[in-house]
Amino acid sequence: MWDSLLTRCLPYGKTVFGFAGSDAHTTGRLNSCFMYFMLDEVSNESIRSCMERGEFFGATHTVISSGAIGPEQDVHAPEGVDQPLARVSSLTTEGHKITLCAGNADYVQWIANGKIIAKQELSDGKATLDLDTLSTADMLYVRCEIYNVNGMVFSQPIVIDRGSAP
């Protein structure tokens, strides 16, 4: 649904950010979804600023395979034990390249316009998507989902700027 909203709203200059929140049906699943903020300092102002700029990641210990986007199989981390997710240290753009740096990550799926455009294993905690190697004419955004056996961390959309935004 989020990708559908993005493809409908971005042409009008409206970015829809994704959030994660626990929808626990048992006490063992409390706090199974949460947010990571890329904070310079811990303050209400810094959190708000990150939210306004999309400098945060959603995280979940439960991921249902849809057959289109997401893992090949459902992910359900065990209840009541430490379940470390991928630790994103940076997501940067330089020219037409997007680079993800993350620890404790197995692979990343790059998604654009609701479709997986690339899947990469992280090499030394790093993966780079080179947009020059892809057909980007209709691409509105790129986002990524970072997986390990305990769940998934997802980025906010990186809007493709062609200099004609409303």
Model-derived regions: residue spans:
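Substrate-binding surface in catalytic domains of secreted glycosidases
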Residues: 1-10
